[in-house]
Amino acid sequence: MGLNAKSVCSTSSTEPNGSIVTTAPSNGEVSSSIVVVVSSSSISSSSDSPIAILPHPDPIPSTSFSSASQRSEEELPGTSAASRTDEMCSCDSQNLAASTAATSNGNKRKRRLSSDSNEDPELGFEPPSAKRQQRLPALYGSEQGNLSSVASSVYTSPVVSVDGQSTQELLSIRSSPAEDLSEAPHSPLPDSPDSPPSPDRGSKQTPVVVRYAAEQVVTSTVVTQKTEDDDLLDDSCEDYSYDEDDEDDVEEEDDDVEIYSSTISPASSGCSQQQAVNGERTPGLPKHQEQIHHPVSDLMINMRTPMSPAVENGLRQCPLPALAWANAADVWRLMCHRDEQDSRLRSISMLEQHPGLQPRMRAILLDWLIEVCEVYKLHRETFYLAVDYLDRYLHVAHKVQKTHLQLIGITCLFVAAKVEEIYPPKIGEFAYVTDGACTERDILNHEKILLQALDWDISPITITGWLGVYMQLNVNNRTPASFSQIGRQKSAEADDAFIYPQFSGFEFVQTSQLLDLCTLDVGMANYSYSVLAAAAISHTFSREMALRCSGLDWQVIQPCARWMEPFFRVISQKAPYLQLNEQNEQVSNKFGLGLICPNIVTDDSHIIQTHTTTMDMYDEVLMAQDAAHAMRARIQASPATALRAPESLLTPPASSHKPDEYLGDEGDETGARSGISSTTTCCNTAASNKGGKSSSNNSVTSCSSRSNP
């Protein structure tokens, strides 16, 4: 048959079912082809694999062979086709055996990697990026001329088990350490498993490394060593120190970060050069875009933790009416939370860390600031903002000198005016009222220090803000029976007139006078602003109104109302008559604002700060506080002194209420006895002169009995 003059050339191809077909054609009239079929199911760790030799149905012309086959004819004359076929099969068997051993070894490592992972995949688990298969060019362990059409499309997740087809595809992939592989940009289009490799992507292209956030770095061509896996899975060797805010940020990132497919579209091919760094799921996205901080979420998380006894008793009942622009319950909850949070930034012991300052110095400074506000017609809100800034600054600062206290006070008023006023005074006006003690440059320099100490939080809800809300609720006649409608926001009718002031300005100023006097005392830092406003309403109006408008329990308001009682007595006796002429002209038109709120207060003179309190009034309050403190200490030392017996009941008086003649010392007993003896002598003399009168005898007897007990 002329087989001696013919050469045997074999080609191999991969079928869709995962089988490798090796064809050995021969040139001649009677040509025979040897097809080696290797089944994927027969691949195991053993070296003996079943090989089937099938005849090729169609002859292949000799012109299809390369010049290498012609050279092999000349070099090997006289070689039989059968022997060459056996040699070819043996070579292929050796290559397949070596590849099978490497593959089985890699499979064991992959299974070990899968078993070491913390989270086992459930049945039917499919990772997100498996929807679009990634192209992973292979590095062939054998000659590329023998296996040139093997294409691999292997998913790189460590938790996906390797099936038969992927095992067969892994035959052509050599096992190499991760350091030898370099990263390459992704292919813009996904490849089909059956499609041949394109000319521009040869076998020399390096595989793609895909990284996942907070997971192990896994590649299809690299089997990570056991020691490296243990280091990645075990975090006990590293120390992590997280804040509460950092933990919140990590939880938000885990929930909000989206898993993007590693296959890049043509539209985003310009970003394909950026590789995944630091475990980012999306290589093209910057790191700062993933780390998004949500202050609203932090606020809602912090609201779950109670911060004061008022919150521990339960949530405050919302007295607000239905609002068209927001949910009333949410608005009230945020207001209460902000008030509790701001109350922690102040303390009654704020002056203990300043040895050179006294509480009276703070009172003098605030009284001077009230006078400045009245001169420049600043709002009450401006003054109370300055008080808040001053107390918070003294709470965080250390060793403030008394010569700098006026500079701190005028700087607080300067910042508050810029926050609240529409037309704040110039900085030269603030420097002028200090009479040369502070310059403009000093105020500007200290403004930076003040804002840094306050952490740029300069918009709290002040006392006058809470007072306006409470009085507005009182005008709207909000009752506890109507509070339940807040839960049904859709069914409740929105009250658009609530945001416009409708209360009496005269009553507002009366209550503000009491709060102005209370502000001079450092004890106000013991209570939150909402509690202070509610306690003031309980004195000027009634306890029921304070409870209804504030939503607080009386157990929360009572300590503040008891502390405010001497201030109320002094302000009721010493306060001048309020010369406040309200010019509240009713809106005549029946459209626009007049239709929405017909009882609107058009005169805003009540919001201008007035100087109606003096230091003399504050001194009287201090004297009343000292007297009350002394009485309280006396009652605690001897509780019986507070008892008063009825007039009809004859009981001996208490020891503290006895006359002074019965409270003599032991040294005075001799004098008292000498006086008694002289009285007895006089009585005896008188009795002897009268000659036995019964009255004198009785007196003598009584005197002698008293002198000799």
From Swiss-Prot:
List GO molecular-function terms, semicolon-separated: cyclin-dependent protein serine/threonine kinase regulator activity
Q: From start to end residue, where is composition biased (Pro residues)?
A: 187-199
> Which residue windows does the record flag with biased composition (Acidic residues)?
228-258
Give the CDD domains listed for this entry: CYCLIN_CCNE_rpt1, CYCLIN_CCNE_rpt2
Bias (Polar residues): 7-29, 61-70, 91-106, 162-175, 260-277
Cellular localisation: Nucleus
InterPro entries registered for this protein in UniProt: Cyclin, Cyclin-like_dom, Cyclin-like_sf, Cyclin_C-dom, Cyclin_N, Cyclins_cyclin-box
Q: Which residues carry this modification: Phosphoserine?
A: S114, S115, S117, S129, S187, S192, S195, S198
Tissue specificity here reads: Isoform II is ubiquitous in early embryos and, prior to mitosis 14, is rapidly degraded in all cells except the pole (germ) cells. Expressed during G1 phase in proliferating peripheral nervous system cells. Constitutive expression in embryonic cycles lacking a G1 phase.
What is the annotated role of this protein in its UniProt record? Essential for the control of the cell cycle at the G1/S (start) transition. Targeted by archipelago for degradation by the SFC ubiquitin ligase complex.
Q: How does it assemble?
A: Interacts with a member of the CDK2/CDK protein kinases to form a serine/threonine kinase holoenzyme complex. The cyclin subunit imparts substrate specificity to the complex. Interacts (via C-terminus) with Z600 (via C-terminus).
Identify this protein by name: G1/S-specific cyclin-E
Q: Which organism is it from?
A: Drosophila melanogaster (Fruit fly)
